[in-house]
Amino acid sequence: MPFVVMITGIPGVGKSTITRLALKRTAINFRLVNFGDLMFEEAVKQGLVKHRDEMRKLDPMVQKQLQLRAAQRIVEIARDEPVLLDTHATIRTPMGYLLGFPKEVIETIRPNFIVIIEATPSEILGRRLRDLKRDRDVETEEQIQRHQDLNRAAAISYAMHSDALIKIIENHEDKGLEEAVNELVQVLNLAVREYD
């Protein structure tokens, strides 16, 4: 049976770092799939964008078509090996927040778990300011908190349409990265029984 763990969190929360470290410690090998990469590859093929950060500025209907194509690819991969799906639950666009997974997309993927990585708005803002490699929109702490609140609401909606369990992992500066990584490893190790 396919085993898919979605891992989400807003930009700057530390999601990619936690994911990379957790995958080194799991009892079974996961295929790390970045949902945005799958969408970006398709958008480049269609000549819609040249840079990944342009994706959120695409027309919402175009984004939804790209999402459905990516979901179909995830299902194909998960038939053979467990998937850790690195993604965003919601995407901030100039017109408002776009759900990362409309109903038909989440029903296609049907993840087993939805893991949300969170931190305080001030921690996220500080991390974003230190990461100059990415072209990110500037947000206030209030906007960052709103985005995290919307991610929780989106995760509940996704769970309703996929029967997934929701796990919230906090990645605070004082808590330590190690604890957040260990929490994710515990979730990922549940896949062992599915691929024995």
UniProtKB/Swiss-Prot annotation:
Its EC number is 2.7.4.3. The keyword Cytoplasm applies. Keywords: ATP-binding, Cytoplasm, Kinase, Nucleotide-binding, Transferase. It is an enzyme of class 2 (transferase). GO terms for molecular function: adenylate kinase activity; ATP binding. Its main location: cytoplasm. It holds the Pfam family AAA_17. It catalyses: AMP + ATP = 2 ADP. Gene3D superfamilies: P-loop containing nucleotide triphosphate hydrolases. The keyword Transferase applies. HAMAP family: Adenylate_kinase_AdkA. This is Adenylate kinase. It comes from Thermococcus gammatolerans (strain DSM 15229 / JCM 11827 / EJ3).
